[in-house]
């Protein structure tokens, strides 16, 4: 059996490994476990082959399940934002969770983080654990200021919510009541389908729900039909509101078409921003407003959405351009998107560009004029002229893809791959719907670290260091050395978690392995580890001993405080080692007073033989260690007396040399007054090396200890444990002083604002030759192997509307970051001709028509949009339901994320699109002048732009 009567480690490992493979089933409950705790458990049970040597090592015993790293401070059930599966937490089914809790218990004061499995997708169903719950605000109709917040699963029903509200506000079951959705403009919507789920009802994060109780006379406070409901399709008692749009102030006809906001359904600003940009793309909007989409709906395309996305989008666009509403609530559109793209089904913040990509692809497939796609064998260039290969590629593309989306948004680029081994050149031409442009990356990042100096009286100092993003631990030490004066080669960098060393880094390890939430401690060690053979660096952890209960003599221990590193002589006496350890902790270990000394001897534990202690306080080789032993306490045993401090106050082997006091360091001599007076030891110590208590030490009359270099390694799994009796710890160990630290002025440092970059710089970076990464190689048909080839992209032809995605977000296993670089992009006359390699391409000039903005950091923040109205040619700012005028000087900002450019020869009045030609012909026949949002002199560029079109 393992600790505390738990199953043996082989059984634990086998059971959990099997349960981790459990398939998700709708309605099942799964539990979140902090990945750091789980990794510690895996080490303890030897889950992975490389951890087998630690199996059963009591010094890596994980202790109670600790999920505090997943929770917001002060909230036992609220998760931190943007947690990532496998990186921050792992998911366990109910049976697995119950087993772990029975074996290890749950940290006191914590509650299980239980989540339901929900089903997503309309046609292709798949299950997903709903990690983030929907937070709803609940109140009574008679007192809407008294709001109570509760969290629900999307799988919970309206009936479940009503029962919870009744419980909160003490409303008896027999009392007739009804629920309402309350929106921001004081509009209400009935919730009268008790079996509907939160997901089906479209309830979103932060939604206010109101319960209304029936009056004694049989009437309702809000009346038989709510007068404040502003829904043109509203009716009672049928529950149709889930499928309809909510409109503000219906019946008005004095709103300018297109100047219509979109209500935020709860973290749906990303969707609103994308829709506003597409809505203000003139050729696409005219296509839908003139019902041209109806004759091109493709209901049978297996890659499409049966026309549902196109129809839902068309309905929304018609409402936005009707001129009747100042804003609409796009719930029906949101529901359709969520059904076909489950990643957008919830109410968590998403990426605007990812939604745009899905929407453009969905509209394309729903409106694809090709009813049966032919199979086409793709060909490599094989030395043929670019013009021939490009025309072939575009023709092949049109044989399978022909829609209004292709007409407006698709272009063609050339991709060239060169094998580094055989020099094989592969050239292909591929269509694109938008350009994702890289931004010049920040080459540096800031890290906050704590420097622990060798002087035991010095508090740890917090520093902010600037290090290369693609660097190693030595770069961190070099930067810290410049601020602190401590030589980089005298530093050891560690990651401390849960009172133990989680990692001890080598100098050549990558900085990318350090995450933002890691607690990085750098220790000053005054020896040269490569040359000094007389000393050894050992990690030291602190443990508090305890008994499992008053009914048993079994003892255990738990980690506390901050671990530390220290250099000690390789050959030492037990007494000198004890004094060195006590000296290292003299800042926060209080010494006894004369009164305390005469009160009686200090007892460092109730029994010197706990955990197999020998008479000298050193654990015997091979003895049990950290958590528990089967040996009973011997209440009559007495501790051995610590030799007089005077006998050991001058240690020839103490690290630091004779000049420590001159250098301001605390030494045994300068701290003698602090150390004197103890007749009994405050703690005992035990060695642990890679899971075994087998570090060689020589036990003779002088009680010498020898650290064997063949066995001892500087590693987070090798350490010296200092075991404290609870009473002595409480009496002499000052935990507040131990946790205290100082801040260096660098912590307040804010990096200077970066200069802007031009959009053309990003385009040049996009077309720059690069070497493929090791994780993304190219298969060379000549070598018959995957190679890290060089790759170059070039633009061949550009579409009428060019969508430019600025790649502000970067992801890696250890880091998530947003680049806030200011990109200077032109409002008009963006000349792309210099980037086209097609020799027949003439000048291609574009004007900006819309911008999607993102404010805030990685994974959160807020989306808005700037857009130019096609009817009056003026700029407007769209912020969810709010629409306001904007000026051109507001548009270029660090928030710009997705840019929409329209080629000058395709604007209304040029007759470029068939619909525009029809409108132009009708205008000529009636004698009505044609309005254009471009000056007449822009037509001078028409001939120049003709050659910019596709080579089909």
Swiss-Prot record:
It comes from Rattus norvegicus (Rat). Belongs to the peptidase C19 family. The modification N-acetylalanine is found at residue 2. Residues 2-223 are annotated as: Mediates interaction with SART3. GO terms for biological process: BMP signaling pathway; monoubiquitinated protein deubiquitination; negative regulation of antifungal innate immune response; negative regulation of transforming growth factor beta receptor signaling pathway; positive regulation of RIG-I signaling pathway; protein deubiquitination; protein K27-linked deubiquitination; proteolysis. Residues 627-644, 931-945 have a biased composition (Acidic residues). Phosphorylated. Phosphorylation protects against ubiquitination and subsequent degradation by the proteasome. Keywords: Acetylation, Cytoplasm, Hydrolase, Mitochondrion, Nucleus, Phosphoprotein, Protease, Thiol protease, Ubl conjugation, Ubl conjugation pathway. This is Ubiquitin carboxyl-terminal hydrolase 15. Residues 7-118 form the DUSP domain. The modification Phosphothreonine is found at residue 573. Residues 597-665, 923-952 are annotated as: Disordered. The keyword Transcription regulation does not apply. Residues 260-904 form the USP domain. It catalyses: Thiol-dependent hydrolysis of ester, thioester, amide, peptide and isopeptide bonds formed by the C-terminal Gly of ubiquitin (a 76-residue protein attached to proteins as an intracellular targeting signal).
